[in-house]
Structure formats: C-alpha cells, structure tokens
UniProtKB/Swiss-Prot annotation:
Function: Involved in postreplication repair of UV-damaged DNA. Postreplication repair functions in gap-filling of a daughter strand on replication of damaged DNA.
Organism: Schizosaccharomyces pombe (strain 972 / ATCC 24843) (Fission yeast)
Domain UBA positions: 135-185, 320-360
One function term, GO molecular function aspect: damaged DNA binding
Protein name (record): UV excision repair protein rhp23
Record InterPro entries: Rad23 (IPR004806), STI1_HS-bd (IPR006636), UBA (IPR015940), UBA-like_sf (IPR009060), Ubiquitin-like_dom (IPR000626), Ubiquitin-like_domsf (IPR029071), XPC-bd (IPR015360), XPC-bd_sf (IPR036353)
C-alpha cells in the first residue's frame, strides 16, 4: 500500500510499497532515500503517538487513507572552520555555539536586547548562529492563517486543541517548539514561570480592585465623579480635562496614584486594570481609548504627579525595529492599541508581549 506523510510545513509526500509487516525503522529508511531526511532525525507521529522503530505498520493499525506526520529535528550544530583551526578537539566547539545562542531564550524575561546578544555571537560562527537561532527568532512566530494551519496540523496529530493552544503559548507561537512540547512535555521552568506570573497577576488584581473600591469616607469610585467634585471645590482653577492634556485631572485623584504604582510595580497588570476601569467607569475607559498616549504618559510619571516630559506632542519614542515588532504582534490578530499597550508594558519585549496577548489580549476585545 501507499502511505501519505506530512511535515510541519504541510508538505505531503507518498511512500510506496509499504506492507503491514514493514517495520517503522524500514519506513524511515525509505523516507531518507526519497526525502533525504536522516533516519536519526526523524520522528513519525500517528494518532498522537511517536512510532517506535521496532514496531510494524500493522501493529499501529495504519491504513492507506490515513496520513502520518513526519517531524524532522534540527541537526546538531557543526564546528565551523575558524573554530576548528583554533581548537584540535571538534566536539567542544560544536556545543559552545549552541549554548551561546540559547542564552537569550533563558534570559528573555530580564532583558530587552536579545537581538544584540545574538548579533554578538554571529561574527564568530554565522552559519551555526543562523541555524540554531531559528527557534527563538521572533520572525519564526506563526501568525494569522499560518498559525491556524499549524494548530490544525497538530490537532490532526491526535492532540486536544486545548493542549495544542497551551503548547503554542508556552512556545511563543513557534510551531516547531510547540510540537516538541507536545511530544516531551512543557519544561518545568516554563510551567513555574507561568504559575508565578498567574499568582503575581492575581495578587496585583486584588490590590487594584481595592484601589478601585469606594473609600470609607464615602467618596465615589468613579474617577470622573471625583474629578467633578475636585473641580467644584476649586472652580478658580481651569479644567485640564480637554486640550493637550485630556486626562490630566487624574493626577489629583489618590486612587489613580495607587493604580499607577500597581502598573509600575507589575507592568503585566496594565491590561487587567484597563478591563476593570471599563467595567466600573465606562466614561474614563472611553477617554483612555481615545487618548492612549496621554494615559501611558501619566502612568510613566513620578509618584508626585510631575510630568516626565513636556506636555504636548508624542511622548513615547518608537524605533523602526520596535515598530516592526508591533506590526508583527498586530498580525497575530489583536487590536493595535492593545498591542501597543502590551508591548510597552512588557518593556518592549516582543516574545513576552506575544505571550501576554495570547493569555489576556482577547479578553479586552470581548468587553462591551
């Protein structure tokens, strides 16, 4: 019989003359002959299981109308010519570049300049860097229809859609890495980080909810109402709710000072805070939506309310590279304003912003 195979790029190929007695190891050899995929790098997946080399096609009950996923792992990095000339032992240099490239992945949460780390390693071994860098390069993120195809492909392997989505989030939307997580499990350090982020988000949300709650003195929780009371008490002062500083009245409200401290201590809570404001103070939420830059500038100011930059004009500088990062995040299917807020809240770290958007981005879009 003829068996159909798919790789992770949705490319199909057919292996002929296969019988129920054909061993999986023999099947891999046929694939190597036809597709030049090394046997050692092949993983054949059917119904969510990795096929063992010593089993036969018949033991897995594979039928001709079915298809098998052929996953080819990345080759081990080889020693470059400059490295070989500098050292007589080939094996140690082969592992060194691999560690250099993986370093940005482990430190991505603390640094916003991962591209500089990769670029620094490139001159010493450009070929190796280009190969090993792919799994963590933001450009390898599957977006839009590409992501949908990747998810469907993994679902067709036999995995639950919820498991696939979880793996994609953990892999920052990288299909190759998500498949590895499905096969081997999500690394414990990533699970721990997600648990810590969830716990921190819950604690910050509780603190923020207390800040939004009415005070014991009977002051209204609605920030616009507080602003109106403040203006009535100080009618001699001109209102600053319009013009170049449409949200300037927030500086005089103690509860906003608390919200600002929460965001400065936990930037990942920005989206949750905006959702809370949308539920409890729709008028303020609309004003923030219409003036996102002014709102972000208020959040960036010092605790005493002084402006960090002169009023008027665009206060946040975005480089061409950062603009491209924002565009790529928008291609994931999120509103641009939400993307900008998440990107800035994550200290302009594209991978962290992507992960945060997949966790919380659609929640804000569902708000009325």
């Amino acid at each position: 019989m003829n068996l159909t195979f798919k790789n992770l790029q949705q490319q199909k190929f057919v292996i002929s003359d296969v019988s129920a007695d054909t061993k999986i190891s023999e099947l891999k050899e046929k694939i190597q002959t036809q597709q030049n995929y090394e046997v050692e790098r092949q993983k054949l997946i059917y119904s969510g299981r990795i096929l063992a080399d010593d089993k036969t096609v018949g033991e897995y009950n594979i039928k001709e109308q079915d298809f098998i996923v052929c996953m080819v792992s990345r080759p081990k990095t080889s020693t470059s010519t400059p490295k070989s000339a500098a050292s007589p032992a080939p094996n140690p240099p082969a592992s060194v570049p691999e560690k250099k490239v993986e370093a940005p992945s482990s430190t991505v949460a603390e640094s916003t300049s991962t591209t500089q780390t990769v670029a620094a390693a490139a001159p010493s071994n450009p070929d190796t860097t280009a190969t090993s860098e792919a799994p963590i390069d933001a450009n390898t993120l599957a977006v839009g229809a590409q992501r949908n195809v990747a998810v469907e492909n993994m679902v067709e392997m036999g995995y639950e859609r919820s498991e696939v989505e979880r793996a994609m989030r953990a892999a920052f939307n990288n299909p190759d890495r998500a498949v590895e997580y499905l096969l081997t499990g999500i690394p414990e350090d990533i699970l721990n980080r997600q648990r810590e982020e969830s716990a921190a988000a819950l604690a910050a949300q509780q603190q923020q909810s207390e800040a939004l709650a009415p005070t014991s003195t009977g002051q209204p929780a609605n920030l616009f109402e507080q602003a109106a009371l403040s203006e009535n008490e100080n009618q001699e002062q001109p209102s600053n709710t319009v013009g170049d500083d449409p949200l300037g009245f927030l500086r005089s409200i103690p509860q906003f000072q608390q919200l600002r401290q929460i965001v400065q201590q936990n930037p990942q809570m920005l989206e949750t805070i905006l959702q809370q404001i949308g539920q409890g103070d729709p008028a303020l939420a609309q004003a923030i939506t219409q003036n996102p830059e002014a709102f972000l500038q208020l959040l960036a100011e010092g605790a005493e309310g002084e402006s960090a930059l002169p009023s008027g004009g665009i206060q946040i500088q975005i480089t061409q590279e950062e603009s491209e990062s924002i565009d790529r995040l928008c291609q994931l299917g999120f509103d641009r304003n939400i993307v900008i807020q998440a990107y800035l809240a994550c200290d302009k770290n594209e991978e962290l912003a992507a992960n945060y958007l997949f966790e919380h981005g659609h929640e804000s879009e569902d708000e009325p």
